[in-house]
């Protein structure tokens, strides 16, 4: 008896050559319905229509096609079970040996901004049911949910009877496919109706097995979406991305995005930004009127730490910038675009990873941030809400000048991306000292101020958290700091304010904290 394949696919990629191979080389009969049946018939592939197979028409506008005992009985029947054999004979069931199903494009529909009613109609019911039935009975039935599986199935079939391990692998992929589908639906409903879910469920396909994790003895895997973020970035040259590369690229790009992002010359004057990052902390950042100046200014902050670092730009990288980039050892450079001349110059650095990621490939704001803890997961909103300077308060007798305000704004944006406790010293739209990841705030201030040294005169200081004491103001004054920006909110705020007033320092409270752990 010829084997029977049930074929119902939304994505029809390679389905015609696959079904032709099934029919011509393996003597399969094809059972299908709706658009898939029409597609196969037009390609001269013989098809048994589901309605004829079940003797039941499609009803409810196509909502019910394959939800029938003859379909699911033919899939779920255990071939060696005597009771099942009796049911098969009593109900005149024909056994289905292969299920080839992929689902209505729900993600694509909702990503395109579909109305609620249209999205609901794109929730597949029959497809997941057939997939799950076949996956449950994978010992007797093979299930394919993606066109990438077709060729391997044909190759395995040519070897003879399919191995149990191969069919179990197909079942795993099938259940993951339906789990991913249900996750997309539940998350869409949660977001559309602004509901708090009692369960946190996300689904990401495996992008790549990484060489190792944070350290060589740790295994690591990269999961993600194929059409957004780093997986959609174009790597123009260089070695494969490592686990640490990806972490640092994420931090570098997140920082530079504070200042706009475009591959075209659409940025306002002096809004071209460059950030150099090492071990998940900025070690230099600058805004200028060109990418080359921004990079060189950022490099001046800490050229020692920049060695082996990551560089991010918020605008096009030209040949002048590339000349400076090739003079230092770097792991990665990321930007929205690169001139051909720039890429030619950077070719000499064969191991340098160059990534191009456009504005359209960036994820939307207001996503979730997650961290693993023992026995669970912490979930929070990402700290990417727009900074509203109208909420800032000048709390000292002396108000900052317009130029000082520009530097305060710049320093505050960089400080947000430095590990807590964080202090950033800036002057003329560039960092001149950064104190990161210290257990006390005054310790971070000492590191940043010492790094900046004599350049601190008329510079500004940003702190990601409030001052518990006036000691940070006191040491800042010793170095010549002229303005301070911090969240405020300490019980001893007045002591810091009084210290600023006595030293002629202006201070601004943002009323928003930016801890980063």
Curated annotation (Swiss-Prot):
Pathway(s): Purine metabolism; IMP biosynthesis via de novo pathway; 5-formamido-1-(5-phospho-D-ribosyl)imidazole-4-carboxamide from 5-amino-1-(5-phospho-D-ribosyl)imidazole-4-carboxamide (10-formyl THF route): step 1/1; Purine metabolism; IMP biosynthesis via de novo pathway; IMP from 5-formamido-1-(5-phospho-D-ribosyl)imidazole-4-carboxamide: step 1/1
GO BP terms in the entry: 'de novo' IMP biosynthetic process
Domain of life according to the entry: Bacteria
Keyword Disulfide bond part of the UniProt annotation: no
Catalytic activity: (6R)-10-formyltetrahydrofolate + 5-amino-1-(5-phospho-beta-D-ribosyl)imidazole-4-carboxamide = 5-formamido-1-(5-phospho-D-ribosyl)imidazole-4-carboxamide + (6S)-5,6,7,8-tetrahydrofolate; IMP + H2O = 5-formamido-1-(5-phospho-D-ribosyl)imidazole-4-carboxamide
Any one GO molecular-function label of the UniProt entry: phosphoribosylaminoimidazolecarboxamide formyltransferase activity
The keyword Transferase belongs to this UniProt entry's keyword annotation: yes
EC numbers for this chain: 2.1.2.3, 3.5.4.10
Gene Ontology cellular component list: cytosol
Family according to the record: Belongs to the PurH family.
Protein name: Bifunctional purine biosynthesis protein PurH
Species name: Prochlorococcus marinus (strain AS9601)
Lineage: Bacteria, Bacillati, Cyanobacteriota, Cyanophyceae, Synechococcales
